[in-house]
Amino acid sequence: MHPAELSPATQDYLKTIWRLGEWEPERVTTTSLAARMGLAASTVSEALKKLTAQGLVTRPAYGVVELTAEGRDVAVHMVRRHRILEMFLATELGYAWDEIHDEAEVLEHAVTDRFIDRVDAKLGHPSEDPHGDAIPSRDGVITPAPAVPLGDVTHPEPVRVTRVSDESPETLRVLAEAEIRPGAVLRVLPGPDRSATVRVRVAGGGTTPGGDVPGGSSPAALATQGPPDVAGTAASGGVTVELGILVAEAVWVQAFTHAS
């Protein structure tokens, strides 16, 4: 089934179900789906009945929602459109990274596959969007870099930011102010137990709003490189910032691994 055969609302439901399961370990539920979409649970339940009848989702347990193979194909197709459009808006039209999500939400339902393929080629077939999320290939393959939430990091070694959630424009503005973007090097600093904030030292090296990384490397490629001199920039340079827990939860990082 091609997304063009479905309504924009159906496309949004399938994409949102997929995105909820992309980074969160918990199963997608009617409640979590309603919260993410800003709709009443009763409205979502009615929509899910229709999606189930269309063979796009299943309900394996009470309140639990899963995509069928056909539903996943549609969802990933829409995710690809969305993320390529975000890159286009940022790199070609100069949109800030806190503006591109809402614009792409509108455009993704109006453009054709041919247009998306042309834009993808124009951009050089990027592997990530400006927020660091992996862009699915034309045949639906997606390979996100392994990452953990910044708030889960307890060791003092430097880590590289691999992606930032685009759900909150305000959070993106806070992180941009702190120069925390995909590719940035961070070190979590000690703080009191049960603190409502996370203190980090930002050593720089992040991408621009358009996703460009100094030196021409993508955030995914940078994750395979070694950290900067630990006795220098990553250890003692940079700026120390204090992030609220909700802001820190929007940042996903990866430990450095040295290329063999």
Language-model features, listed with the residues they occupy:
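Key DNA-contact positions within bacterial/archaeal DNA-binding proteins
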Residues: 42
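Extreme N-terminal segment that seeds HTH/winged-HTH DNA-binding domains in transcriptional regulators
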Residues: 1-39
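Mid-protein regulatory/catalytic core that forms ligand/cofactor-binding pockets
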Residues: 108-245
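A short, conserved structural fragment
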Residues: 53-60
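Ordered, amphipathic secondary-structure segments that act as subunit-interaction surfaces
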Residues: 80-116
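Basic, amphipathic "hinge/linker" alpha-helix immediately C-terminal to the N-terminal HTH DNA-binding motif
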Residues: 63-82
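Short, hydrophobic-biased segments on the C-terminal half of alpha helices
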Residues: 48-49
